[in-house]
Amino acid sequence: MIGSFLLLGALFIPIGVVLKGQSDGVVEYSQQYDGAGSIHTECGITEANTNQECTIDFTANQKMEEPVYVYYELSNFYQNHRRYVKSISYKQLQGKTDSADVSFTDDCQPLQYITKPDTTNPDTSKQILLSPCGLIANSLFNDVISTTTESIAAGFGMKEEGIAWESDVEEKYLQPDGFKYEECFDTVGDSNCSTLCNQEGWCGTAKEPYVDADSKKYAFFYPDDINIQYLYESYPEVVSPIEGVKNEHFIVWMRTAGLPKFRKLYGIIEKDIEKGETGEWCEYLWNGLFATFN
């Protein structure tokens, strides 16, 4: 019996040595940019619905080999609360959309609807179904973190794809049934985008084509958008209408944390950061702590 334990111990020693070496090789830098204790007073938010932008500098005291992972950290946020965890409609996240029969969203209580002015009668209001509904989806971390133009020019651009589980992206989160989009073009004397958007079944009610970061234009359609508010409408600074629930920041957020203090992956830098190099980050803020690892 003792011999068996000694043998097992001997087998685990090299594994422990390897894991310890990898752990010691991790380089971490973090800065709190909002809340009590933050030195970045320019980043603080004191009112709701405030767009606040600030820049944070990181100087590497050690070399960070690629890939460098960028995380945000929240504390005192109980994603593991029973009522919070249960407030989700998996059928809706799989594409089911029907504002006339919303029994499939019952699990989203207490957050299935929001009240908005009635577009047909400004003096009244109406309930609009949220898609996706529920507390998890509608408490999305919506700070926008990006490297500055100067950092991007120096090769420190941050990739925001490949941060979520591949199985989640491909199978678990699907755009609403009936959703479609198509790239369109505007030329002198011929507005393909306007033609598409004026056709029934495209671009929705009084919506303009979506223009991405590369200045490409897209006509798009979401079913029953008069009676449903979709994710891109709830978080226009974070989620585009073309990606919707396929947005990887959203998918990462939907994997709830087990503890009230947690980190979630935001992006990846695919370039070594040499000792002494300084990177600048733009923050469009909510509340959190920002960290980098390699």
Residue ranges with predicted function:
Residues 1-55:
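N-terminal leader/pro-regions and domain N-caps
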Residues 19-35, 77-90, 291-293:
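Juxtamembrane interfacial secondary-structure elements that flank transmembrane helices
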Residues 8, 65-67, 276:
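Generic preference for well-ordered alpha-helical elements
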Residues 51-251:
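Soluble non-transmembrane domains of integral membrane proteins
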Residues 70, 266-294:
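Extended, hydrophilic extramembrane loops/domains of integral membrane proteins
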Residues 56-61, 249-258, 262-276:
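Short, surface-exposed tryptophan/glycine-enriched loops
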Residues 165, 202, 253, 281, ...:
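A residue-identity detector for tryptophan
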